[in-house]
Amino acid sequence: MWNKKLALLFILLMSLALVACGGTEATETPAEAETGETIETGDLPDLGGREITVAVENAYLPFNYIDPATGEPAGWDYDAINAICELLNCTPVYVEAAWEGMIQAVADGQYDMAADGITITEDRREIVDFSDGYISIEQRLLARIDDDRFDSVQSFVDNPELVMGTQTGTTNFETASDILPADRIQAFEQFPFAVQALIAGDIDAVIIDETSGMGYQGVNADSLKLVGESLSSDQLGFVFPKGSDLVGPVNAALAAMEANGTLATLAEKYFTDAFTITYEDLE
């Protein structure tokens, strides 16, 4: 299954990519994470209870959303950052923010960091700093299941009648712009709107991260499919203002969470069949 492969990829990526950073002052008291894992906090920086403002969209499954059963914020980002702050002795203060403008707002110092399944790119590195990558995401085409006009990215590009949808301000939009002229791209404020347009027949495909695409396909198994090869493979990371003193401690916490199995537990919770919440549930 795609999601089990993704979970294994998650663990492998963290094993290869994360680099532990030493701290100055440490605490020896174990902390209990949301995942149920006991996290040893020795040899990690102690932020002394510092409040950390975290920008989240609350509209990007499975990273952050409002749980329809409880009305409370939930998702991978919340569990991961809560665990990070337990390790580092900090207090997360979550602030809902629109995706469009979120990265610039972090760059301007409005937030201490942002967590929204954000792709690490060199262009973004010019204005913000990133944590180490914590997951690798493939970009794919989502199409109607009965559409046989294309079976690959290239055959989609070669058909001048086909229009691709995506979300504005994303790396998916950038990828679409690299392969198609502007008049064959329709940008939406959020991916759910793009998928609705696809199902309605207003557009012919949506370029989307595979994690989200599989979620939409699962909910609409009789009407949607993923088509063709991966367009790109991107790493996701947390975003910080340039020069932030939080990057090193957060990277150290991520490395500790990879080592003690917390990240593997989160991968199992959010990137396998265990996660059943859909965008339809959020409506």
For the regions a language model picked out, list residue spans one by one.
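Short helix-initiation/N-cap motifs at beta->coil->alpha
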Residues: 76-79, 94-104, 151, 186-200, ...
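Extended ligand-binding regions for polar small-molecule ligands
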Residues: 78-87, 145-147, 162, 170, ...
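Ligand-binding clefts/hinges and TM-proximal coupling segments of bilobed small-molecule sensing domains
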Residues: 26, 37-42, 171-186, 226, ...
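Flexible hinge/capping segments at coil-to-helix
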Residues: 131, 144-163
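C-terminal motif of bacterial Sec signal peptides marking the signal peptidase cleavage site
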Residues: 16-20
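Extracytoplasmic small-molecule ligand-binding "clamshell" domains
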Residues: 36-118, 126
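Periplasmic-binding protein-like
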Residues: 58, 136-143, 210-255, 273-283
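A ligand-binding cleft/hinge motif common to bilobed small-molecule-binding domains
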Residues: 100-104, 118-127, 175-178, 199-200, ...
